Amino acid sequence: MPNYGSLHSPSLRKMEQSRIQYGRKRLSLGNIIGDPFALATISIAFLAWIISFFGSLFAHINQPPNTPGVNNSFPLYTWWAVVFYFFLVVGVFIVVASDSVQTYHVAIVGYLGCGLVLSTSAVHGLIYSNIGSREAAAAGMILLAMVTIVWIFYFGSAPSAVPRAYIDSFALAKESSTNRQTMNTGYGIGRPETSTSVQPPQMYTAQLNGLENPSPVGGMQSSGMRNSAVPPPFQSTLGQKSNGLPGSSDGDIAPPTEYPYRAKAIYSYEANPEDANEISFQKHEILEVSDVSGRWWQARKENGDTGIAPSNYLILL
């Protein structure tokens, strides 16, 4: 059995290729035009910012004089909200266009939270005025606040969340092979796995009497196993890939007989031609799954083809 650090492992080559492509991302309008959610929300945000900017500009120029007991001066902190949202919307545009959402989503959510506070404060200072320009600026800030709330929910949710996975299923740009390799084939780089299990069940037989090896690495065996005449349990390639570790693809895996789970593909996947155990599938295709532990699931297609599939391309039904 080749060790886990073998340079000939297809999985390690995937990881290395993912690291190389990670630094080559360029801005592409196709990532926005091909994503209806990003196109709609960014367009509304830019339009709302333009309304807020010109409304605030005319309200600041044409502000009426103060009367006794009434302060009619324009709230200057509104300009800080306008400037902040300009860079915020541009930043979201750049992140989505460069397909770097999984890299910067935490920072985006933090900035969106600050922007929501600023926009609601600006609305409070403008909405109660009877001046048309201030009301227009307040309307723009309200639209920005609404888009911000939607963005916080989207960017703050895991890619495996049902609402976000449903929204991402309409994005055509996420179908490119470059995005699939960068986001998912790096075993932890990009979209997280949909299963929280990190270790498959241990193999136990009555003949071993509790002396089986609990370690996933074959070279680290317990003293009881070394002193026993019974050979260690066989660990297949499937068990290694279930733990997210690259394994050997020398032999085929005997498929299980039961597939109690059903999963839907949220991305298309092309099997590695050097690994006979992987299976290809198309977006929105329904697969039957036998085991949902680990990053690789044993799956069966409707035509009867069986193999292993990356769990972060699938969502359980």
Curated annotation (Swiss-Prot):
PROSITE patterns assigned to the protein according to its UniProt record, in alphabetical order: SH3 (PS50002)
The protein's name: High osmolarity signaling protein SHO1
Residue ranges, Cytoplasmic side: 1-36, 97-106, 157-317
Membrane-spanning segments: 37-57, 76-96, 107-127, 136-156
Coiled-coil zones: none
Keywords: Cell membrane, Glycoprotein, Membrane, SH3 domain, Stress response, Transmembrane, Transmembrane helix
Record InterPro entries: SH3-like_dom_sf (IPR036028), SH3_domain (IPR001452), Sho1_SH3 (IPR035522)
Lineage of the species this protein comes from: Eukaryota, Fungi, Dikarya, Ascomycota, Pezizomycotina
Species this chain originates from: Podospora anserina (strain S / ATCC MYA-4624 / DSM 980 / FGSC 10383)
Subcellular location: Cell membrane
Keyword Glycoprotein: yes
Domain of life: Eukaryota
Residues listed as glycosylation sites in the UniProt record: 71
Role played: Plasma membrane osmosensor that activates the high osmolarity glycerol (HOG) MAPK signaling pathway in response to high osmolarity.
Positions of the SH3 domain: 258-317
Compositionally biased residues, Polar residues: 235-246
First-listed, main subcellular location of the protein, grouped into a coarse class: membrane
Family matches, as Pfam families: SH3_1
GO CC annotation, single: plasma membrane
